[in-house]
């Protein structure tokens, strides 16, 4: 068994050594591995060559009149891989002074205090453009992750479901008090006529693409030039800056993002990044250009393409846009906690992934775009790999947009508060309740949070 342990300061390392002196364990900052059974260890190399890039980056120049974004890399004072074939879980718990399980792979010493767990971003406005959540078989509170979050954030949205599940969704959401959710019946002709890009017909599920095309056209019928379409398995939305991810109880993540995306005449799609892809200790930029859009997607309605493909339809649509000279933007300043593809019952999991795995999914993308995609095996299953480096288009402002007189920072009315821990994940952990009970919360400096 192995566990990586990170120490932020020299004082943390000294505390660890004092705690474990009786065991004969002594760690210094140059160590990289330590065998708890034998006391043997390895150290860092004395010399290393720098691999840091000296190339300039222009993304910050575009980040005007937007929320603060500043993430510089920082190093832990020490990071050591501890190994053992002898010690028990209880022994390890005593050594690291925290709960350890057989699945534990990484800890920080001392254990991080949970106080930041109850920080919430509030304030600001709702988005200008409609939000659609495409859902299937996820109408109860446990599975309707995105819908629950949007209600806790007080964000109006549409939930698109197949007609045979309409009553299940409507009754469930009514009983849960999800007043911000409007359930729409999918026009099944969108599913029947959907281009799956294969010859398997109705023998397996067709995926969410047909419903997403319905959302696209529905937003046009309602008079909108853009729309959002979200997966139904999002647990949190976050604001990332100063090396910390803040949980949001506001829709500023959508409002600020759409304001940014629509500044440019050659941006067809935007999305929010997955939180799990953003390392809080690494240098980061507020957005990434010309890559795949997924799960929390913003689309310009006059884009001359539509969803297609039984699998990997998000990557296919992204490549449709990119290969024809249009840009995409993935936000890093705002992110979403996405439940992994095959962990939640319903949706595509019940359609095919739980039966087929992911091989067919990856193969379809390779068949459609062989010049960009290939299949690889990693993390114990088949994945696809796409080389996005060939897409180097630059952002172009709309002709009627000017940066004159723009401030560098626009906080969009966001505030940060620390809620009582007993409110966490209850009905009180909602924007409406928090903002009406601010006297019971502690206001916190948004940009001065102990890491």
Residue ranges and their predicted role:
Residues 124-130, 138-141, 309, 315-451:
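C-terminal catalytic/acceptor-binding lobe
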């Amino acid at each position: 068994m192995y566990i990586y342990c990170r120490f932020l300061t020299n004082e943390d390392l000294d505390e660890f050594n004092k705690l474990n002196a009786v065991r004969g364990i002594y760690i210094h900052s140059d160590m990289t591995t330590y065998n708890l059974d034998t006391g043997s260890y390895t150290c860092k190399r004395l010399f290393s060559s720098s691999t840091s890039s000296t190339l300039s980056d222009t993304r910050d120049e575009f980040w005007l009149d937007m929320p603060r974004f500043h993430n510089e890399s920082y190093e832990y004072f020490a990071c050591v891989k501890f190994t053992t074939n002898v010690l028990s879980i209880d022994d390890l718990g005593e050594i690291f002074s925290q709960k350890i399980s057989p699945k534990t792979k990484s800890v920080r010493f001392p254990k991080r205090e949970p106080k930041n767990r109850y920080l919430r971003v509030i304030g600001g406005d709702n988005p200008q453009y409609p939000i659609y959540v495409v859902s299937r078989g996820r109408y109860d509170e446990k599975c309707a992750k995105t819908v629950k979050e949007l209600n806790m954030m007080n964000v109006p949205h549409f939930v698109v479901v197949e007609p045979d599940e309409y009553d299940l969704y409507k009754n469930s959401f009514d009983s849960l008090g999800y007043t911000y959710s409007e359930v729409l019946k999918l026009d099944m002709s969108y599913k029947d006529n959907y281009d799956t890009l294969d010859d398997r017909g109705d023998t397996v599920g067709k995926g969410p693409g047909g419903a997403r095309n319905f959302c696209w056209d529905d937003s046009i019928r309602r008079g909108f030039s853009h729309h959002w379409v979200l997966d139904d398995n999002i647990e949190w939305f976050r604001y990332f800056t100063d090396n910390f991810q803040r949980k949001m109880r506001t829709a500023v993540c959508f409002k600020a993002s759409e304001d940014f995306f629509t500044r440019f005449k050659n941006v067809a799609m935007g999305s929010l990044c997955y939180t799990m892809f953003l390392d809080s200790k690494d240098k980061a930029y507020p957005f990434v250009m010309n890559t795949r859009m997924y799960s929390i997607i913003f689309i310009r309605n006059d884009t001359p393409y539509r969803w297609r493909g039984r699998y990997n339809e998000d990557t296919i649509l992204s490549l449709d846009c990119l290969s024809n000279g249009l840009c995409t933007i993935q936000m890093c300043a705002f992110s979403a906690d996405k439940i992994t593809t095959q962990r939640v019952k319903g949706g595509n999991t019940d359609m095919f992934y739980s039966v087929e795995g992911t091989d067919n999914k990856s193969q379809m993308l390779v068949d459609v775009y062989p010049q960009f995609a290939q299949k690889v095996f990693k993390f114990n299953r088949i994945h696809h790999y796409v080389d996005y480096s060939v897409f180097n288009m630059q952002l172009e402002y709309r002709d009627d947009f000017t940066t004159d007189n723009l401030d560098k920072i626009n906080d969009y009315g966001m505030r940060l508060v620390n809620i009582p821990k007993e409110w966490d994940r209850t009905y009180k952990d909602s924007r409406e309740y928090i903002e009406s009970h601010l006297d019971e919360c502690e206001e916190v400096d948004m940009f001065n949070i102990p890491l």
